[in-house]
Amino acid sequence: MQIKHNLLDIEGTTAPIAFVHQILFPYATKNIHRFLKEYQLTELQWKEVQTEFQKDTSSGDPLFIEKFRIKNVPSGLIVNEVPNTLSKDMVSVYFEYLIEKDRKFGPLKEIQGKIWKEGYESGEIKSTVFDDVPKFLNDAIQSGIQNHVYSSGSVEAQHLIYQYSVLGDLRQYFTMYFDTAVGGKREKTSYERIASTLAVSPSEIRFFTDIVEEAEAANATGMDVVILNRPGNLAQKPHPFPVWEHF
């Protein structure tokens, strides 16, 4: 069946991994304590944070324990029990830990997006996008193909990356944006939901990613997939999918 929709990952696909890990993540870490002093977490966010925190207290991860010892959080809190309500200071330390672990955690991604928005709007951040991206997106549109985004970063963060890119505002090239609200990127059902939202057969969608497990999940629905091997991308396990060095 003819491809009518491109579904594109961001990190390692349209933007360098280094930009995300060396610019965006450190900026969020540097500003998260200040931001959480002013930002009111929603009731749902608090609940999700506490649930995730409880999972980590029983994981025994040395980095987790060390993170809280450095911040003088009582060790008994880590080993024995978690209070019903976490202080904002503790949440900011926990989010620093999650950033370091590159955890795909909804509330963190939402708050990161808001912090990055401040950075983009102040001019402190300018996103790096691969040079071949605008032409590829424009050529697709000229051929009658719509472009969409699917990233673990929040939809707000996705808009910001393309709005404030070094190549100009690229949002004109995209129709829809999807984040983990539709599900994890390694889950088949996530791609089924995206196809359903677009009201097309999965076989009419081509998914571009740098991660084989994501490609496998998408391909299991009938989507066509392409693996991007950009500079700085991680080596992938053997797979049957086509590999592109560039668009």
Swiss-Prot record:
This is Enolase-phosphatase E1. Pathway: Amino-acid biosynthesis; L-methionine biosynthesis via salvage pathway; L-methionine from S-methyl-5-thio-alpha-D-ribose 1-phosphate: step 3/6; Amino-acid biosynthesis; L-methionine biosynthesis via salvage pathway; L-methionine from S-methyl-5-thio-alpha-D-ribose 1-phosphate: step 4/6. It comes from the Bacteria. Binds 1 Mg(2+) ion per subunit. The lineage of its organism: Bacteria, Pseudomonadati, Spirochaetota, Spirochaetia, Leptospirales. It comes from Leptospira biflexa serovar Patoc (strain Patoc 1 / ATCC 23582 / Paris). Its EC number is 3.1.3.77. One of its GO terms (molecular function) is acireductone synthase activity. Monomer. It catalyses: 5-methylsulfanyl-2,3-dioxopentyl phosphate + H2O = 1,2-dihydroxy-5-(methylsulfanyl)pent-1-en-3-one + phosphate. Bifunctional enzyme that catalyzes the enolization of 2,3-diketo-5-methylthiopentyl-1-phosphate (DK-MTP-1-P) into the intermediate 2-hydroxy-3-keto-5-methylthiopentenyl-1-phosphate (HK-MTPenyl-1-P), which is then dephosphorylated to form the acireductone 1,2-dihydroxy-3-keto-5-methylthiopentene (DHK-MTPene). Its cofactor is Mg(2+). InterPro entries: Enolase-ppase_E1, HAD-like_sf, HAD_sf. Belongs to the HAD-like hydrolase superfamily. MasA/MtnC family. Keywords: Amino-acid biosynthesis, Hydrolase, Magnesium, Metal-binding, Methionine biosynthesis. Disulfide bonds: none annotated. The keyword Metal-binding applies. The keyword Metal-binding applies.
